[in-house]
């Protein structure tokens, strides 16, 4: 498109051409008047014609200049408005550019924060996995220790039960022999009617039924049943036995 300067140059050229055309017409009329100097009756008419053309030329020149000045003023105002609009557009563009730069910096900062958070999350997940694995190992080890302790406790309880049963049996046997010996001592210290007919073996055999019928003892047997180190059943039984 044409710029303001191009349009002004075009108007000036047009004005110059119109002015030259009017001047040429006046010159032609002047030549015609000079050629017709011999005609006195046309002198006044030619003078009037020349005056009319001069007035017309002056009017055209003035109108052209006024139009040119008006057009120039309009274009200058339009140019000023365009310059103001351009200035505002540049200012707005600069503001948009500043906002874009600020948003770009903010986006970069958010990206950095996001990457940092993702890295921390990965580290937390890795640490959690390690701690979880370690905890599972510890739990498995503790469960194994508990099972071993329960087995060991059950073993000790069984050994204790066996020892208790053996002790009870020994106590019963010792008490039985003690009573037998006390009974024999009592028979020996008793006066015998005929020593020649006394038989120690017969005396012991005779004494044993008497002791069995005379002395008795309550035997308490306590049974403890365990499973995995825990007592699941406990019972007590009374038995009559010799002492």
From Swiss-Prot:
GO terms for biological process: intermediate filament organization. SUPFAM superfamilies: Intermediate filament protein, coiled coil region. Residues 1-188 form the IF rod domain. It holds the Pfam family Filament. It comes from the Eukaryota. Residues 23-45 are annotated as: Linker 12. Residues 46-184 are annotated as: Coil 2. InterPro entries: IF_conserved (IPR018039), IF_rod_dom (IPR039008), Intermediate_filament (IPR050405). Residues 1-22 are annotated as: Coil 1B. Belongs to the intermediate filament family. This is Vimentin A2. Keywords: Coiled coil, Intermediate filament. Expressed in low amounts in retina, optic nerve, and brain and in higher amounts in spinal cord. Residues 185-243 are annotated as: Tail. Homomer. One of its GO terms (cellular component) is intermediate filament. GO terms for molecular function: structural constituent of cytoskeleton. One of the most prominent phosphoproteins in various cells of mesenchymal origin. Phosphorylation is enhanced during cell division, at which time vimentin filaments are significantly reorganized. The keyword ATP-binding does not apply. Vimentins are class-III intermediate filaments found in various non-epithelial cells, especially mesenchymal cells. Vimentin is attached to the nucleus, endoplasmic reticulum, and mitochondria, either laterally or terminally.
């Amino acid at each position: 498109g044409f710029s303001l300067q191009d349009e002004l140059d075009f108007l000036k050229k047009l004005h110059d051409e119109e002015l030259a055309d009017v001047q040429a017409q006046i010159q032609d009329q002047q030549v015609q008047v000079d050629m017709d100097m011999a005609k006195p009756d046309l002198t006044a008419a030619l003078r009037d014609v020349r005056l009319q053309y001069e007035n017309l030329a002056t009017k055209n020149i003035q109108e052209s200049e006024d139009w040119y000045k008006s057009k120039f003023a309009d274009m200058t105002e339009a140019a000023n408005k365009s310059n103001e609009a351009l200035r505002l557009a540049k200012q707005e563009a600069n503001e948009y550019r500043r906002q874009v730069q600020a948003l770009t910096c903010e986006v970069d900062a958010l990206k950095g924060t996001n990457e940092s958070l993702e890295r921390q999350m990965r580290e937390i997940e890795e640490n959690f996995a390690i701690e979880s694995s370690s905890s599972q190992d510890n739990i498995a080890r503790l469960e194994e220790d508990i099972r071993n302790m329960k087995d060991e406790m059950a073993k000790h309880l069984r050994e204790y039960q066996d020892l208790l049963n053996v002790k009870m049996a020994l106590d019963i046997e010792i008490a039985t022999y003690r009573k037998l010996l006390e009974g024999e001592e009592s028979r020996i210290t008793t006066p015998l009617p005929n020593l020649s007919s006394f038989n120690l073996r017969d005396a012991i055999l005779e004494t044993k039924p008497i002791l069995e019928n005379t002395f008795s003892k309550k035997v308490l047997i306590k049974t403890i049943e365990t499973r995995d180190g825990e007592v699941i059943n406990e019972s007590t039984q009374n038995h009559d036995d010799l002492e």
